[in-house]
Amino acid sequence: MAQNYVENYPYELTEELTGDETYVKVKGKNHYVFFVSDKVKKIITSYQVFDKRDTLAAIKTIYQTLLKYPVKPKNLQLVVDGNPIYQLAQLYFSLKNIPFNLIQVIGLQNKTETDRTFPPYKQLTERLNRSFKQEAYLTMNGFNSLEKANGYLILFTAYFNFLRPHESLNRWNPVEVPEIQSCPHMPAKWIKLLELSYEELGA
């Protein structure tokens, strides 16, 4: 139910995006979480678990983010790691007349000019992955199906975007919803979020 609200909320996003992958265990085998988030607003715009870390997964992840924009920004910029699947995904969208700037940062050692220019992007993706692992995934000790892994990821994204205060945002949430913020404690905020999701489902 929360997915309706997370997906359809009218986010106010910037042109600066960052993406990354991390792994989770599903039935004891490695699967891959693809994240894209707004570098400035700290809003997660794409989130999905795939059984392969391939070009199709990158394309689906980027497309999920593009759907969050009413109109694609002219200077949309996506900063990712050095995985070549993102170059192929960029080519795919270019052939569909949906161009965007792709910047690939190799590692965390600041060995190249690009690495030195975009350290905040690298730090953001590392913090997001760390938050997911420490605050969500480690308590689950893996998943027994891909469907359950993605269901849990929806809840994590709802929490991260609407309920979790961020130090870099002066303890504000990435998305401030008055109906949620007026609730006295976290359980009440979750209930309100689910109520809003139900209303979105019936709209």
Identify what each model region corresponds to.
Residues 10-26, 35-37:
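Two-metal-ion RNase H-like nuclease active-site motif
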Residues 138-203:
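C-terminal domain-tail junction helix/linker
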